[in-house]
Amino acid sequence: MTFSWLPGQSELNLQQDLLDTAAFAAKHYAATLDARAVFPDQAALAALAVFDESIPEDPCDPSVVLETLATHGGPATTASSGPNYYGFVTGGSLPIALAARWLGDAWDQNSALGRMSPIAAQLEQTVEHWVTDLLGLPKETLMGLVSGSSIAGLSALAAARSHLYAKAQWPFAEKGLQGAPPIHIYGPDSLHGSIDKALSLLGFGANQMHWLATDSEGRLLPSALPTLAPNAIVILQAGQVCT
């Protein structure tokens, strides 16, 4: 296969060239990370105007895309994976994690089903075994991997909601929330904002949420926890982003 805008350039050769260019730019960024300012300067921010363009009507040289990203995008990054960043709780990427992610991107797997990607299914199963072992959960525990903590909170609350409705013999799948038995939510008063949003997405109103006192480390005070009815969900945390 050749590309009409790059006469004689094969797809394979172009892909190799692009990967080499991206790898070079990434290595340079990683090598200079320690010396980078945490936040870009005004010149770098002003240079972002190069990306403010109309949707192109014709294709362009892919190498120009990478060059533009490296030249104007790289300096406008926040060095959150570097040693001088003390902002949000943002973990730096380990070298092996970054390299493995590159490889995973090249594999470009659809992991919806095990048959669609045996390696993705195997890795997820291995992580499942590790987590259940670390937490002392039953061996028959099943787990699903999500994109991050916000979706994890949403998924956990959805599972808790379904469990309570099943115990109350409410056919949630057929009738939904309309007319469903009330559920009350109890949690620390310093919960992450994503929990509020997750509860709202799941159909819980403010009157169903009861926020309880915490100590200076964001831990729930046991004395603040009331006697719970069977229709209650308790949200706990070991701390929060400021502790």
What function would you assign to each model-found segment?
Residues 90-104, 108-233:
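PLP-dependent aspartate aminotransferase-fold enzymes
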Residues 221, 237-243:
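Active-site core of PLP-dependent enzymes with the aminotransferase class I/II
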Residues 2-140:
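N-terminal entrance/gating region of PLP-dependent enzymes' catalytic architecture
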